[in-house]
Regions:
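N-terminal amphipathic alpha-helix/helix-capping segment at the start of soluble metabolic enzymes
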Residues: 2-48, 77
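Hydrophobic faces of well-ordered beta-strands that scaffold small-molecule active sites
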Residues: 35-43, 63-66, 88-92, 117-119, ...
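Short, acidic/polar
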Residues: 44-55, 99-108, 147-148
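Catalytic domains of carbohydrate-active enzymes, especially glycoside hydrolases
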Residues: 50-71, 108-113
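Glycine-enriched alpha-helix->loop->beta-strand junction motifs that scaffold or abut catalytic
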Residues: 60-61, 84-87, 112-115, 135-139
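Active-site-adjacent beta->alpha loops and helix N-cap segments on the catalytic face
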Residues: 68-84, 97-102, 120-136, 145-148
């Protein structure tokens, strides 16, 4: 039985950047070769890790991961979500911020339109479970060591 070789057809996509937006940040083209992950029917191949709203508005990433080393505040999540043209994953706790506070922040982030919430290590497993039970969006947990 002979195997048929599949050739990948190269697509030409028209592109327009405009004069004022020609200085936006572009991710490397090789990102398009990644498989990515599909969440709620949207395929995400790239994440920009930033809380800078100017970068959020001027980068061609498929999603934004907005995590910062301070106590999460709904007003910051709302500002980033309202500026972004793409899905946003917002930080809702870890370390100092945990328990019911992280749970309420996650619920509020979901109501604000976040695509997912992020918990930074260290975070107790029971808090992760509690948040997962209360929201219907992805819960991402950072891992810093094999034992966590």
């Amino acid at each position: 039985m002979s195997q048929q070789l599949k050739t990948k057809m190269v697509k030409t996509v028209p592109s327009y950047t405009g004069t004022l937006r020609s200085h936006s940040l572009s991710l490397p083209h090789c990102v398009s070769e990644c498989s990515g992950i599909r969440i709620f029917g949207k395929r995400i191949k790239s994440l920009a890790f930033t809380t800078d709203v100017a970068i959020v508005k001027n980068i061609n990433a498929d999603a934004i991961m907005a995590v910062y080393p301070f106590t999460p505040q709904p007003v910051i999540a709302d500002a980033i979500i309202s500026v972004a043209d793409v899905p946003v994953f917002v930080g809702v706790g870890g370390g100092v911020t945990s328990g019911m506070r992280s749970d309420r922040l996650a619920i509020q982030a979901e109501h604000q339109g976040a695509f997912g919430v992020v918990l930074n290590a260290p975070i107790p497993n029971d808090v992760v479970r509690m948040i997962k039970e209360d929201v219907d969006i992805p819960v991402v947990v950072t891992v810093v060591a094999e034992s966590t």
